[in-house]
Every structure is written in structure tokens, then in C-alpha cells.
């Protein structure tokens, strides 16, 4: 029987998880030809799902073979995804060994009309930026590179200390590229939504507000869908966003900027697909044949190594010469950094978290109406709590993690948000009296108020950041001078430009170095240097002071951080990683299996290890229990796999795709513990 000319076979990827051992697309019958990228509704396993059309072909005589195809229910929107988005989705799916439908779901926002008008960013008068020679040279190098030539490297690393004018380079590069081709679009990636208000303020001063859009988890589903459509039509020229912005339907990109490129927040580690937006952005730049710039005061070890090996063009910016720019207080160029040995504080009977040196500097800053940032990388009133009767640590029943005492009187788990009542009981002896050990943001706040009861304090940590518009409010209040002291975790360590901040206190540097992870030293160095860079900004009236508190002042990373000695830090870390074949010299996949039954976990991981250890060219760790042994009631066990840089062995990839439900495959993890 001949196929009818009006019938077509449509290949559709359902927007759901399909096992990697199966084909990621399904064939359906349609009376009409449906273009690739179209969003459709399809029947699948007694359910109706949305899917994306991958391709179309003519029907063929299949009745003799007994092949019956279901029909597509309806076309929701034609060409919903662009060809570039489909190509990018396939790359992410292949590299991160993640189901294509799960990946594509990130490219499809909920189709909801915004209840209110999109937020106006505010039209501001365009300013003129006076560039230094080094800044101008950087702009020229970026903007005049022709990416259509295959021999030209269009990837750059912009490396310069905090306050060196990297943002000014981005803005001028965008302006020059846009002047030559007004149809181009630009993507500015920021690591966290906390940096959104300042990014809007800075870019909004130079570009039309109606051409700028923000994409982050802070905006509503309706606003996101509206923004998506405007990007697709070309109405929006500049997109400022967190990692989710890389999925937007850009028509023609001219430049991608990855600001604070060292930040681990660019990696999605807690759900599929476990992608790194920095690597995905590089592929997006290749697809659009556009330039891409990574910028940082403390580049990741891998990025700097790649720049030294000519994979990126290295552009270095010196610290701004304020005298050259005509800024009065040019003599305030050097930050005074002190390392305080907290062992000596204990010998002197000071048992608080605030050293005498830091207390003195806080008093001085408050006296002269200057602002202070106190950095502690842990929220709550303590690190953990123990039963006073039997010394048992109070733990989460679902995750087995130590619970953190909050000033509301309850204990909370940072992993699953489990909360106790106000009077929890010890699981072992039934005791109700607990001693809180260690530090957190709330305990530091309490101690500061004991010393300085009139000080106005803001606290920025992950517990508070869940409140709507919290980031905008905290930045607005502190930049307007409504608070004297900002106490916060990682979210305050980068990006914020606050000229009145003259003092930085790093309360517990040891906490940053305490994890047995190969990334720990890099994270610690970056955190200390980044948060120190919040002081002594251009326009400051007082010299910057940084106080680093530690029980191990002899620690090399603490010393190099205090000196802001990136070169020596880089050489130390690279030497260690080369010896162990760790990134950037090798690649890593972290395999985690989790289940409510511990015996099943043991068996699954043991069976997988047996199959994997026979593969040539890979090195495996023994199956082991990770730092977090249980999450939300599920037991966990993991295997770390190392193999040569970038290219995953074909046999390993096949075995990983065979793994069933319960397995987590994390390529290029940000932690191996």
C-alpha cells in the first residue's frame, strides 16, 4: 500500500525523563508537515505531554510491518524553539549524559500571561565613561575581533583586581559592537540573583531600559514568558541573567559576558541537567559565532590555566590609577590587611567571635560614619548543637546532618528545611538541654549588638534570601546608608560596589578550609579575596581595612589570600592538581546512588563498580559514603571517576547511560565529597 502524500511522520522529544538506554524521541503521525522546534501536545504511555518536534519525514508503507503510529494531539506553537536552541540542547544532553527531554524543558517557559506590567528598569541619562589606556585597549581587543574567521580566538579572560573597571570594559565593548551592528543581542551572565539590582543600575545607566531584560528565578512565570517572546522577536537587546538565561531564544548574539566567572553558582549541581553555564555559554558562543568574555578578580584555576595555554585570549587590567582619573582620594589605593591569630584571643580570655583588633576597627569605622561588612560562611546561631547529658549531636532525621540553631528557638536542616519544635528531644537519651557549638550569622549579629547596641545591622544569608525581593531590599538599604553593618554569607562576597564600606571582617577563615575537597583551597582563596575587594572601592573616603580571623595564621592559603597573591596561589594549586591528574589536567564524573533502602544502595553501587573498573583509561575511587550520607530519608553512596582531559571514553559513556533510576551522574562536579 502506498503512503498517502498528505501524511507525515514527526519525530518528537517529550519534555519528560526518558531512560538514556532508549531513543530520546518518538514518532507520531500528522496530516500536515510540522517544522522543527514546534511545541506540540502528544499522547505517551497513557499520559498527555508536551514535546518539541525534532524533524519531519514523509510517511512510508509500514502497514505490512505492523507499525502503527499515534497522532499528535495538537500544535501549541510553531517554531517555539530556534534551530540554535535545539543544537544547544543536544550538546548539553550529550556532554552531561542527561535525557534530552529534561534538558529541553529548560528551554520552554510556562506560557503564562503576566498579571502585571513588566517591571520598568527606569530610563537613566546615558553617561560618558572615561577609560584608562588599559581599559580602552581591552575594549578594542574584544570588540574588533572577527569571529567569522576560524583561525581567530574569540574567547577571552579579563583578569583584573576588584575595582579595576571590568564592568566599564563590558559596557564599552557592547556599545562598540552594537554601533557596528544594531541588530545584535548581548548576554551578561551573573552568578547569583543577589547581583541583579546592581547590574540593572549599572547597565541601565548606559543603555535604553526598554532594550534590557532580566532573567532569574526572581521574576514571575508570566514575566519570564513575556521576556522570552521579546528576546525571540529581537525587541530585547541586552539580557542580564543568572545561569537560566543561557536557554533564551537569542536571534543573533554579538557578545556573551560571564561576570565573576570563578563563581561555583554557575554550576547546577542539585538537579538534572547538572550543567555548568560557563561551559554551555562557550558552546552558545560557538553556535552564534560571537565573542565571549570571562571576567574575574580571582579567575578559576581552570580558566587561568586555559588562558596561559592560549585557549583564551588573556587580557589583564591593572588596579585603577585614581590620580590619573582625577579622583581626589587617589592615595587610598592600598588596602591594609591584618591576619589575627584567634588562639591568642583565647589565651587573652576573649571567647567571642570578634577579636580585639576587629572590635577596635569596627568602633573606628562607626565613629567616622563608615560602613562595615562581616563575612561568615554559615547561617544561624551555631554550627551544630550537642545534648548536654550524653554529648550526642542533634541531627536531621531525614538527612543525618547536624541541625543549626536559629534565633527563633528552633533547629533547622540546611538541606531539606526540616524544622524541630521549640523543645526538641535528644534521640539517644531524651534530654531537652542542648549546647550550641560554633558560629553563624545570627550569633555574630548577637555579639556585635552586645558590643555596639546602637549599630544598625542587616543580615544577608540563604535563610533570608528566600523572601521575595530580599536581595534588592538589602542592597538598596545598605547602599543608601540605612545600616552600618552588613553580616552575610557567600552572597555578599562579590559584585557589590559600595564606596562607604571601609572595613571587612572575615570572622572564620578556617571554616572555608575545613572540607577535604580538592576545590576547598580555591574556594577559600576566592572568597577571602573577593570579600576583601568590597573595601577601598573608587570614590572611598577612607582607606580599606581587612581583618582575617583564623586559628591557623601560618596556613599558606590564608597568607596568600591576605596578600592577594594570585600568581603564587595558582602555581601552588596547579602543581598539586597536576600530580593527582585533577582538573584542568583531567576530567571527573561523580556517580551517586540514593535509595530509601541501604542494602539496595550497597548492592547497586557494588555492581556498578564491578562493571566500571574493567574499563581502560579510567581511574575509580572505591565506593564510599559521601559527606552528606542521607538526604530526605534516602541513603547515598558514591564513586568518583577520573579520565583524561575532556574526552570521555566511549565504553564509559555507554555504561553510564545504562544506569537506572536512583543514579545521579554529575560531570565536572564542583565537589567530590
What role is predicted for each listed range?
Residues 2-146, 154-155, 163, 340:
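Terminal, basic amphipathic appendages of nucleotide-handling enzymes
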Residues 18-21, 580-586, 630-633:
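Short, flexible turn/loop "capping" segments at secondary-structure junctions
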Residues 33-38, 598-604, 645-653:
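Short, conserved charged micro-motifs
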Residues 48, 622-650:
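Short, intrinsically disordered low-complexity segments
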Residues 87, 618-622, 659-673:
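Conserved short beta-strand edge segments in small beta-sheet-based binding/regulatory domains
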Residues 127, 132, 155-237, 241-602, ...:
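Inter-lobe coupling/hinge segments of SF2-like helicase ATPases
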Residues 452-455, 612-620, 660-661:
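Short secondary-structure junctions
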Residues 610-614, 619-632, 669-670:
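A carboxyl-terminal module marker
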Amino acid at each position: 500500500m502506498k503512503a498517502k502524500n498528505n501524511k507525515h511522520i514527526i519525530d518528537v522529544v517529550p519534555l519528560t525523563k526518558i531512560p538514556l538506554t532508549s531513543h530520546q524521541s518518538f514518532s507520531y503521525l500528522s496530516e500536515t508537515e510540522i517544522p522543527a522546534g514546534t511545541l506540540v501536545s502528544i499522547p505517551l504511555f497513557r499520559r498527555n505531554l508536551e514535546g518539541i518536534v525534532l524533524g519531519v519525514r514523509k510517511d512510508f508503507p509500514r502497514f505490512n510491518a505492523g507499525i502503527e503510529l499515534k497522532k499528535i494531539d495538537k500544535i501549541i506553537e510553531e517554531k517555539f524553539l530556534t534551530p540554535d536552541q535545539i543544537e544547544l540542547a543536544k550538546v548539553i544532553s550529550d556532554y552531561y549524559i542527561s535525557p534530552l527531554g529534561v534538558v529541553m524543558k529548560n528551554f520552554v517557559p510556562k506560557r503564562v500571561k503576566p498579571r502585571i506590567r513588566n517591571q520598568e528598569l527606569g530610563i537613566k541619562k546615558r553617561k560618558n565613561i572615561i577609560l584608562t589606556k588599559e581599559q580602552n585597549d581591552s575594549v578594542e581587543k574584544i570588540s574588533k575581533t572577527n569571529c567569522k574567521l576560524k583561525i581567530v580566538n574569540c574567547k577571552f579572560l579579563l583578569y583584573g583586581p576588584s575595582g579595576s573597571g571590568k564592568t566599564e570594559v563590558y559596557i564599552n565593548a557592547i556599545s562598540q559592537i552594537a554601533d557596528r551592528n544594531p541588530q545584535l543581542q548581548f548576554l551578561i551572565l551573573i552568578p547569583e540573583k543577589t547581583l541583579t539590582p546592581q547590574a540593572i543600575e549599572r547597565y541601565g545607566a548606559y543603555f535604553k531600559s526598554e532594550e534590557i531584560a532580566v532573567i532569574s528565578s526572581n521574576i514571575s512565570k508570566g514575566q519570564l514568558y513575556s521576556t522570552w517572546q521579546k528576546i525571540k522577536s529581537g525587541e530585547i537587546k541586552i539580557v542580564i541573567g543568572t545561569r537560566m538565561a543561557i536557554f533564551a531564544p537569542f536571534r543573533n548574539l554579538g557578545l556573551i559576558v560571564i561576570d565573576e566567572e570563578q563563581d561555583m553558582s554557575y554550576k547546577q549541581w542539585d538537579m538534572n541537567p547538572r550543567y555548568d553555564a560557563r561551559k554551555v555559554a562557550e558552546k552558545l558562543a560557538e553556535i552564534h559565532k560571537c565573542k565571549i568574555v570571562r571576567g574575574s578578580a580571582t579567575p578559576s584555576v581552570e580558566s587561568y590555566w586555559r588562558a596561559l595555554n592560549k585557549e583564551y585570549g588573556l587580557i589583564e587590567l591593572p588596579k585603577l590609577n585614581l590620580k590619573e582619573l582625577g579622583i581626589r582620594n587617589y592615595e587610598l589605593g592600598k588596602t591594609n590587611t591584618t591576619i589575627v591569630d584567634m588562639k591568642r584571643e583565647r589565651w587573652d580570655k576573649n571567647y567571642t567571635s570578634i577579636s580585639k583588633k576587629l572590635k577596635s576597627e569596627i568602633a573606628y569605622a562607626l565613629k567616622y560614619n563608615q560602613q562595615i561588612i562581616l563575612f561568615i560562611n554559615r547561617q544561624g546561631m551555631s554550627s551544630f548543637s550537642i545534648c548536654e547529658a550524653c554529648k550526642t549531636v542533634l541531627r536531621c532525621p531525614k538527612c543525618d546532618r547536624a541541625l543549626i540553631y536559629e534565633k527563633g528557638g528552633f533547629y533547622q536542616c540546611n538541606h531539606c528545611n526540616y524544622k524541630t519544635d521549640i523543645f526538641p528531644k535528644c534521640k539517644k537519651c531524651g534530654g531537652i538541654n542542648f549546647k550550641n557549638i560554633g558560629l553563624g550569622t545570627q550569633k555574630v549579629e548577637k555579639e556585635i549588638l552586645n558590643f555596639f547596641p546602637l549599630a544598625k545591622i542587616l543580615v544577608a544569608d540563604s535563610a533570608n534570601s528566600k523572601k521575595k525581593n530580599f536581595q534588592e531590599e538589602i542592597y538598596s538599604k545598605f547602599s543608601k546608608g540605612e545600616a552600618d553593618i552588613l553580616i552575610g554569607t557567600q552572597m555578599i562576597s562579590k559584585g557589590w560596589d559600595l564606596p562607604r564600606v571601609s572595613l571587612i571582617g572575615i570572622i572564620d577563615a578556617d571554616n572555608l578550609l575545613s572540607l577535604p575537597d580538592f576545590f576547598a583551597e580555591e574556594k577559600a582563596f576566592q572568597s577571602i579575596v573577593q570579600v576583601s575587594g568590597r573595601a577601598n572601592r573608587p570614590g572611598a573616603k577612607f582607606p580599606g581595612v581587612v581583618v582575617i580571623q583564623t586559628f591557623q595564621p601560618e596556613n599558606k592559603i590564608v597568607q596568600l589570600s591576605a596578600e592577594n597573591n594570585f600568581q603564587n596561589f595558582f602555581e601552588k594549586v596547579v602543581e598539586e592538581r597536576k600530580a593527582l591528574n585533577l582538573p584542568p589536567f583531567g576530567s571527573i564524573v561523580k556517580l551517586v546512588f540514593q535509595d530509601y533502602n541501604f542494602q539496595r544502595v550497597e548492592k547497586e553501587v557494588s555492581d556498578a563498580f564491578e562493571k566500571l573498573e574493567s574499563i581502560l583509561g579510567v581511574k575509580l575511587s572505591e565506593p564510599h559514603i559521601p559527606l552528606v550520607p542521607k538526604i530526605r530519608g534516602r541513603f547515598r553512596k558514591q564513586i568518583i571517576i577520573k579520565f583524561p582531559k575532556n574526552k570521555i571514553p566511549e565504553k564509559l559513556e555507554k555504561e553510564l547511560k545504562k544506569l537506572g533510576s536512583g543514579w545521579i551522574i554529575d560531570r565536572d562536579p564542583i565537589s567530590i565529597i
